[in-house]
Amino acid sequence: MNSSNLNYLDELVKEYLIFRGFTQTNHYFSLEKKGDKLKGFQVDRILEQINIYISSYDINHLVELWNFLDITFFSKIDYNKSNAYNNNNNNNNNYNSNHNSNGSYTSYRNNNNDLQSTIKKLSSSLRKYYVIYAINNNKIDKVKEFFDQYSLELLKDPDWQSWFALPYIRNPQSDPLFEIYFSKTWSEAFSLSLRNFLSTIFKNIPLPKILQFNLERQNRKRLETQVENLLSINEELRSQVDKLEYQNKRDQNNSGSNNNSNNNSNSGFTIGNVSQRKESNVNNFNSGNDLNSSNEREVNSFSRVSKRFEPRSTSSTNIAAMDDDDNKPMIGIGRSRKSISTNSVNSNNNINNNNTSNTNTNTNTNTNTNTNSNSNTNTNTNSNSNTNTSNNNSNSNNNNNGTNTNVTNNNGFQHLNLSGFEMTEIDENGFKKKSSNGLNGSDGIENGELVYNIESQEVCTSHSSAITRCKFLSNGSKIASSSIDGTVRLWNVGFSSRQTTIYCLSEVASLEWENRSKLLLCGTIDSKIKIWNSLTDKAIGDINTSIEFPRVEDIACNPNGNSFATSSINNGRTDGVVYTWNLRTLKTEEKLSSSGAVINSMSFNSTGTLLSTGCVDGTIRIFDIKSGSPIAGWQAHSNEILSVQFSSDENRLYSLGKDGKLYQWNIHSMGKPVKEYDYPGFLVDPHRTTKISFNHNQSSFLVGTNNKFALLYNIDQSSPILQISGHTGPVVTCDWNSSSQSDVIITGSLDKTIRLTKLSKSFNNL
């Protein structure tokens, strides 16, 4: 029994008495506590008190203390054991024979007799110890006083009959009957026996319920700590097992597919040979064995590919020429894509019929476009583009594929500068030129406009398969990236090094940070959600979702920090279900009534009360989280919705569809988009969903494309204001960590790379 527990409980009792107004009771309680006979159940202090009574020859208080201990504690130990025995016999009387029961009772009776005998012997020895101490100190009068006071009681004990002569023996130390009691050995043995007995009694006495509550609370905390430690050990072992299973699976795939290209089978477009590389700062999205090449990749996460991007002026071209590797066909080239126009007010949907693009994925490509002006641009794969801004006729000769391109400048299209990654035409100072037609408005460039420029870019090549998702932690200190091989990597942005690899054993389709507790949620295509604590760098556990809907298509964390939503669909993508989960218990809270809708993308509003969803049937549905039912919905796209995102003002909503449309909506005037953005289209095959990412003040947003770049938009301008290039495959995921001081963009592609791009901001004061 811990004295600190008693003191803590005493303070609680005093606090309760004062709270109830029992001031007099509290006063007496304090007085009795000062005269505590038990000394807080501290054996040393009780023995010290016994020695004080003996040394002061206070036999009355000595006997009183012993009787108090006997009645209060010693007898209760006996009573408790008796009850335990009786209960045990009652519960087992149908199974024990009479012989066994009698044997158990005999054993108990013997133990009980031993306890009573021990108590009686210690009581007698304590009094003998008092008498011997008095004789050793020549206090014969105290000895006679003792026998006079307790003679009637002692005469009943045969062991004491010879002790009545002790005060009259001249030299009792040499008397054979009493010699042993005057030895130091007997005195020390008695003191040790008494100490051990009291310690055993105090450890086994039944505690009051009020004290048991506090002890149980402490015991529960101790057990919880043990459970946490065991869970941590279990997760470490599971992580090791997952890693070994992943390596085994990789080795099996490696042995069976040495001559196959995973990139060709997954992306559906022609890949150049490994030897055909540009001698520039980017790597081609090439074929080769994914698993073999992963062993050759460096462990270091990011490598600097450019220190500074200087914007340069460029000529106009159509959207098909925006890629820096035009000779290779792009995913989705077979369908029409909206061209990016500088003036969407006049030419949002106008496509010049004089411009044609013919692509052959098996042979070299020759593209001819008639132009009305004259300019010459010679492009070589080993050098940067040379642009003559005084002429208006461009002729591009590529030594790798022999592509010749003539571009018109009267179709309203603007070429994206691949060297500086700056959209539209710019002057010698790096600012965008004003529109030649002099139009002002949402798409015009006005004085004082914020301009983004790419300052630097780093590339990560540690993933061995196509990227599926990448996302910043809210404070920008960490990056999570996932790939189709089932691995998730956590990166420390400040140190630019790979920190942790999480093995999920199947393709990771969704990724989400819970920013308050720094948890990472990874949804896979085999009915699992892995939850990882980035602070402790350990797994919390796995959530098993419905086997009927194995693909966890999207995860969205509620801004209130209490829950998250998951959208799971079946393998045929014909049915799905949406659940909300309690983040603390990891149990389902609500099943949203989606009326059979298959949901690809989800987004909470800033208060966490509404959930917007983008569906396979092209509709946007908005759910009320409290009721779990849709409160609004409209047909937004003619094909699947791949991304839907709430703005922080809770009035605007952005959506991206497989139909190549990128819209801004007002949820109070549904049915007609507020703005349509010039967008080249997103990846069609294989199926991917994505996220639209905003800067800190929601004035700009970023989105990936089926080309080899991501596009940055001002929310009030239809045309993109910046292109984030460098990838050699479609950009399927991106995220933007923005603050008033810095802007960092991360993009992930089917080329297996992650690119970290730092932006600089300036204002156009022309």
From Swiss-Prot:
Q: Which keywords are on file for this protein?
A: Endosome, Membrane, Repeat, WD repeat
List the GO terms this entry assigns under cellular component, sorted alphabetically: cytosol; early endosome membrane; endosome membrane; late endosome membrane
Q: Where is this region: Disordered?
A: 88-108, 249-415
User: Cellular location of this protein?
Assistant: Early endosome membrane; Late endosome membrane
Question: Which GO biological process entries does UniProt record here?
Answer: early endosome to late endosome transport; negative regulation of phosphatidylinositol 3-kinase/protein kinase B signal transduction
| Ranges of Low complexity composition bias in the record | 253-268, 339-412
Q: What one GO molecular function would you report for this record?
A: phosphatidylinositol 3-kinase regulator activity
Q: Which Pfam families match?
A: ANAPC4_WD40, CTLH_Armc9, WD40
Repeat positions for WD: 462-501, 503-542, 547-591, 594-633, 636-675, 684-723, 726-766
Query: What broad class describes the main subcellular location of this protein?
Result: membrane
Membrane topology qualifier: Peripheral membrane protein
Compositionally biased intervals (Polar residues): 269-304
Protein family: Belongs to the WD repeat WDR91 family.
Function of the molecule: Functions as a negative regulator of the PI3 kinase/PI3K activity associated with endosomal membranes. By modifying the phosphatidylinositol 3-phosphate/PtdInsP3 content of endosomal membranes may regulate endosome fusion, recycling, sorting and early to late endosome transport.
Q: What is this protein called?
A: WD repeat-containing protein 91 homolog
Native source species: Dictyostelium discoideum
